[in-house]
Amino acid sequence: MRAVTYAVVVTLTFIHAPVLLGQVKAQTLVAVWAHADDETSVGPILARYAREGVQVYMVIATDGAQGAANTSVPRGPEIAKLRVEEAKCSAQALGIHPPILLGFPDGSLGNYNADPTLLLRLTQRLQEELQRLRPDVLITWGPDGGSGHPDHRIISGVVSQLVRAGAPGVPQRVFYSSIPAEGIRAMNPARDAPPFLIPQASLFTMRVPFSDADFEAARRSMACHKTQMSDEAVERVTKSMRDVLKGELPLSPMVPNAISSDLFR
């Protein structure tokens, strides 16, 4: 992700399913992203659900080799190694499982001419991970890609394709994360939202609260991505988040339904 995005949050009601030996299966939440640092768009939700006992994972499609927004390290293998460590730091700050890194080329997910097999391989690889994890809920970018980044849009499309196809292990409860106009301005004060990038407010029928502790975990997670954001930018963005969100963040279901405050119901 080239721009840090807004956090999304929820409360949790456990719904236990019996399994062998009298044990219960914990709920599983998977967030699917293009880049390490995209997870900052839902940082508080990941922290909260992990704290409440949900098995929380993030899947990152690209190697991040082209993301050098806040570092002198050249693009390529060196920056990719740093971003792996940043993703691990972020996951630890949020209290979730270590990141699942698929390693596809950063900035090139939609480059069909360079590699006609890439999109198919990405779809198959992501489906394999989801079949292994069997999440109850998925979170990913909306069709706008949050910041409009092409890799974000590709990930949204692949996840939506798997849901619509009823792929094994892929749930029907899928929520889109987006960035409000205020968020785009906070990330880059000189930039306004591109035309038609911000979804209509009426689509955000999932509105979920988050605690100060969840927000602080998300701030620490964001601060892990030092190749992407300066300390000053982290503070500016988190202040804007706090002012704009006011303790809850809206999400858009892939298929809009009744207004709710619980991803699992």
Cite the ranges covered by each PLM segment.
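A broad, structure-centric signal for solvent-exposed, well-ordered loop/edge residues
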Residues: A7-V8, A68, L109, A217
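Active-site rim/loop-helix segments in enzyme catalytic domains that contact anionic ligands
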Residues: L20-L133, Q161-P168
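Hydrophobic membrane-insertion alpha-helices, especially the h-region
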Residues: V9-T13
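Metal-dependent de-N-acetylase/amidase catalytic core
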Residues: R2, Y6, H16, L20-L29, ...
